[in-house]
């Protein structure tokens, strides 16, 4: 009889206690996060006098970012504070890890300070899993991006954005364009889209920037930008992750833009009501033209806004589930 492995993200009852990856989560769990996030959108409403709810009052949330981040770290901090948590942002460059202390020693010391939740971004794939294996049962871990592996909250906020504008996934064609090989966002988006029943997921990019096995994930692969964009409902652009590249995978940024940059002419090949997304940071003139990034079909800034509600939902859900 084959051995089965428990999902480390779930309690014995199948509830979400950590968010480490979208892979392995059910449609019901993803939908629950999106539905809960919808309820939190009103908390961030500009007309609301007090933008707080007491869900995490008395809880301590540690943001541990071992890689630089602006949007993700800031939106996690805002999300935790709107849930009334105490938030501690650890300055990793000045911390003991830069002096040789191991990752688990750091976690154990912070746990001794009564941490209730760790939000972790790390250059090593699997680091949040390692932390989740070693924390106390009442402590929760959220992956804010680990190496090339996963960025589950970005994937969820992308799904929230798509659902907000398109309502239903079952008739959608979504194109993910660019450096998919090095993109943890692309992996999370693909798993989320297929789990939520998206009709067709496309990957567009040069052969050097597309990983093997995409077809086995149910993804249609295109190397020609124009062909890949025909009739799509959603375009998700990705930046070139030069910091993760080894060797010359591309001739130049200018040549890349000529072949794969999203211009208004190329966007016209998609459906007239197609939306344009980007997880940021954008490289204008490399993967996207400013006229498109700032155009009427762009929902890029809305993604950032929705990210707060989605991260509030994730934190609120995991905090309520213990073995």
Curated annotation (Swiss-Prot):
Pathway this chain belongs to: Pyrimidine metabolism; UMP biosynthesis via de novo pathway; (S)-dihydroorotate from bicarbonate: step 2/3
GO molecular function, a single term: aspartate carbamoyltransferase activity
For this protein, the record's InterPro entries field holds: Asp/Orn_carbamoyltranf_P-bd (IPR006132), Asp/Orn_carbamoylTrfase (IPR006130), Asp/Orn_carbamoylTrfase_sf (IPR036901), Asp_carbamoyltransf (IPR002082), Asp_carbamoyltransf_Asp/Orn-bd (IPR006131)
- Catalytic reactions on record: carbamoyl phosphate + L-aspartate = N-carbamoyl-L-aspartate + phosphate + H(+)
Binding annotation for carbamoyl phosphate: 71-72, 121, 151, 154, 280-281
Signal sequence extent:
none
One GO BP: 'de novo' UMP biosynthetic process
Residues the entry annotates as binding L-aspartate? 99, 184, 239
UniProt entry keywords in alphabetical sequence: Pyrimidine biosynthesis, Transferase
E.C. number(s) listed in UniProt: 2.1.3.2
GO cellular component annotations of the record: cytosol
Role this protein plays: Catalyzes the condensation of carbamoyl phosphate and aspartate to form carbamoyl aspartate and inorganic phosphate, the committed step in the de novo pyrimidine nucleotide biosynthesis pathway.
Family indicated by similarity = Belongs to the aspartate/ornithine carbamoyltransferase superfamily. ATCase family.
Q: What NCBIfam families does the database record attribute to this sequence?
A: asp_carb_tr, PRK00856.1
Q: How does it assemble?
A: Heterododecamer (2C3:3R2) of six catalytic PyrB chains organized as two trimers (C3), and six regulatory PyrI chains organized as three dimers (R2).
Name of the molecule in the record? Aspartate carbamoyltransferase catalytic subunit
Organism whose genome encodes this protein: Ralstonia pickettii (strain 12J)
Q: Which gene is the coding source of this polypeptide chain?
A: pyrB
